Amino acid sequence: MLSITPVALAKTRQSHLIDFIYSHQNGNESFGVSPQDTANAIEIINYYNAYVVEILFEPTKSVEKSALKGYLGDEIQAMFDTGEIDIYKIYNFLETLNTLESLATSLDSDLHNEIYNYINETVQIGGGFSPTNSSNNANMVSTYYIYNILKIMGEPIDNQTLHKSWVLSCNNTDGGYGGNQTLSSTLFTTYYAVYLINELGIINDLANQTATLNYFKSLYIGDSNNLEHYGGYLPDLYSEFPLLSSTFFCVEGIGLIDETELSRVATSNWVLSQQSFLDGGFSDWVEGTDQRFSSISTSYYAFKILQFFGSLSLLDEEVFMVELDILTLIIVLSVIGVIVLVIYIIWRRRRI
């Protein structure tokens, strides 16, 4: 069947990545399956100014900015109309809007005030922010996202010293940080803590800078004989495979503390090796299986790691990818058909 026959095409890694992202575009101009997917996709599209992509023999790919902005505003407003407010969705909606156009002009002033008033109700007396205005418990994840909501909206963050002290109180003896004062360290909450300390003060304010640096470094796969995983970072010490997400958080975290501790070449090469030759996206191994899956989020983490290292030029390399392209198949098969026909005619003439 033409619709399922793969064809190998040579384009730049960047072009394959953009094609992959557009293959996950939805009818309402959003991308993927979550607000985060849309925010990630638009950041990459915006970086490459790929809002309209026209390639010979391929359908035009594009983002209708005004339609997407309208959709995002409606989604935020619907949350407040129903009372089902999700700060993580709000963050990603605002991030997307701000990429498309400054929030100063793209966000309705009444909606801006609704968001700001709600956020103010999540502030905790002891520092940090709770995930909802009905909760009295701050956690690292909600504090990270609410801090960044305020930052995107251009609103001041009051009591920064109090919030910084709360973040520091989540420090653990392993050098990592938990989601609150009682939880064990995780890579993600440790990164959020390091980011917040750097934003609310200076990186030297970390409870134990060396221990936190070693926490990140302990997840690095530095065995050059491990060709498949060398250069990546594990999500935890019990994991079998490095992930693009864990590598992103480790690279960003180490970069904030001491950038010289990073292995730029090894990690960049590992990231490139994660690009799928089937769909052009970047993929991770799935624990417990022998399969890999590409997604917008994994592709975004790959993009951000290369961007951090100043290595996005590596995506200019031309590579062959297997694509399911009906038009290309028709062209290829037509050429083959012509060649076969010529051979047949020559053969017939020789027989005569």
Language model regions located:
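Structural signal for the C-terminal ends of transmembrane alpha-helices
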Residues: 346-348
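An alpha-helical repeat/solenoid feature that recognizes helix-turn-helix modules
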Residues: 1-6, 30-60, 78-107, 130-158, ...
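Juxtamembrane/start-of-transmembrane alpha-helix segments at the extracytoplasmic/lumenal side
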Residues: 316-335
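Boundary at the C-terminal end of the N-terminal hydrophobic targeting segment
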Residues: 8-10
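Cytoplasmic C-terminal tails of single-pass
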Residues: 350-352
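Long, well-ordered core segments of solenoidal/helical folds
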Residues: 12-31, 59-83, 109-133, 157-176, ...
